[in-house]
A protein has these predicted regions:
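Short hydrophobic alpha-helices and adjacent helix-cap/hinge residues
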Residues: 1-175
Length: 175
């Protein structure tokens, strides 16, 4: 029994592709894999009451299912599992993916958790743009307005300012 816990809703291309890829790789008659897929839809619903409801739902739903593995995608699922795994899924191995701003100490007390982080090179990207197009005066960045989109914007600005790239080119974001 493998639980795939996605942070977002099932209609997002990223979620569809990731879920399908996991099933394609791990679905085998040899292993008789049974998948359980949960989509937290946390870009649409993000408050303490909602996460409490998910805690209660998953507790009831998986109480008698002997999970062998949990695969989580993105920060909300990762954070939810870190906060609740010892109660909901004690000793079940967890592999996360797509986690932003990861620090090893986040899982230091969780030997059952491992995974792959998500990182991008914003400063290197801007430097490459300026090297390829030295006449550039303005860079306009398009991002979404979700919680993670706003966090990316802040992080990018912090990195760009720290590298003094804002003195070479004007950076603006879609507002």
């Amino acid at each position: 029994h493998i639980l795939i816990l996605n942070s977002y809703h099932q209609e997002m291309t990223w979620v569809k592709n990731l879920t399908q890829a996991v099933q394609d790789v791990l679905d085998s008659d040899e292993f008789n894999t049974i998948f359980h897929i949960e989509n937290m839809s946390s870009k649409r619903h993000y408050n303490e009451q909602y996460f409490d409801s998910l805690f209660n739902l998953y507790g009831a739903k998986y109480k008698k299912i002997p999970l062998d593995l949990i695969l989580s995608s993105d920060n909300h699922a990762f954070n939810f599992l870190r906060q609740n795994t010892r109660i909901l899924f004690p000793k079940v191995p967890i592999v996360f993916s797509g986690v932003n701003y990861f620090k090893p100490e986040q899982i230091a007390e969780y030997p059952e958790i491992t995974g792959v982080t998500e990182a991008f090179s914003d400063v290197d990207t801007v430097k490459a743009m300026l090297k390829l197009h030295p006449e550039t005066k303005d860079i306009f960045i398009i991002n979404d307005y979700t919680l993670s989109g706003k966090a990316w914007t802040k992080t990018m600005l912090d990195h760009i300012y720290a590298a003094n790239l804002d003195t070479q080119v004007r950076i603006s974001f879609a507002e």
